[in-house]
Amino acid sequence: MELKQIYDIQNLKLRFKDKKALEIKTLKFHNGLIYGICGNFGSGKTSLLKILAGELKETNGSVLYQGNKFKRGFFGKIKKHNDIQYLDANLLNSSLTVEQVVKKNFPKKTQQIKSRHFTTFQMESVWKTPLNLISDGERHWLKTIIGVEKDQRVLLIDDYGLSIDPRTEIILRKKIIKMNNILGTTVLLSSGSDYFLKQFASVIIYLDNGHVSKVRKGFKKNSNNRKK
C-alpha cells in the first residue's frame, strides 16, 4: 500500500543575508517512516528541520505539510502545528532541573517517566540536577525522552546520537522504534554521521552545502536482523 505524503518540498531556498543555507529542488517525506538527515557541519540539517517544524520560514519555494502550507499570523510569523514536535537540546531551559523540565511537559505522569526512563536505566542521579550542570549526553537523553513521551504525529530531533555512547544510543533507538511502531509517528533525525541512522532509519537523506547529494534506503523492518 502506498504511503501518504506528510511533507512535500518544491524549489526550496533559504538564505541568511548573502549566505545560501538551503537549495532543494524536490523532496518528499511519507507518513509513518523514520528518516535520517545526514551531513557535515553547515550542510543545512538544522535549517531543514526547523523549516519542517515551522520554526523557520523559507526564503522561496513551497513546503507543504499534509498538503497545506503553514498558516501565518498578521506579521508573517508561522503558526506552529500542535502535532509537530521539534527537539533541540539547546532549547531546554538550563535554569530548571531535570525533574522540573519533565514536570512542565508531563504534569500528570512525572513519576511514571522518572521510573520508566531514569530509575530503570540508572539515570536517577540527574533527576534533581539543573540542566546547566548535566553533561551534553544527559541533555540529549532528556530531549529524546520528551520526544518519545509526547503523542505527536511528527517528531524531529536535531543532532541525534551526539555525545552519547553506543549503549545509551541503543536504548534511545529502541524507544524511538517502539513509538514509531505503536503510534505510527513520522520521525526525522539529523546527525553528522550516518553510523547510527543506518541501523534503523527507513530512508537516509544526505545533505551537502544545502543541497540533497543523495537519498538511500536504510534499515528494513522485515529484514532478518532479529538476532539478540
Residue ranges and their predicted role:
Residues 61-72, 78-80:
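Conserved ABC transporter NBD signature motif
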Residues 38-40:
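The feature captures the beta-strand-to-loop junction immediately N-terminal to the Walker
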Residues 7, 22-24:
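Conserved structural motif at the start of ABC-family nucleotide-binding domains
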Residues 190-192:
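H-loop/switch region of ABC-family ATPase nucleotide-binding domains
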Residues 89-90, 95-111:
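Q-loop/switch helix immediately C-terminal to the Walker
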Residues 53:
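Helix-to-loop junction immediately C-terminal to a conserved catalytic motif
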Residues 117-133:
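Conserved ABC nucleotide-binding domain
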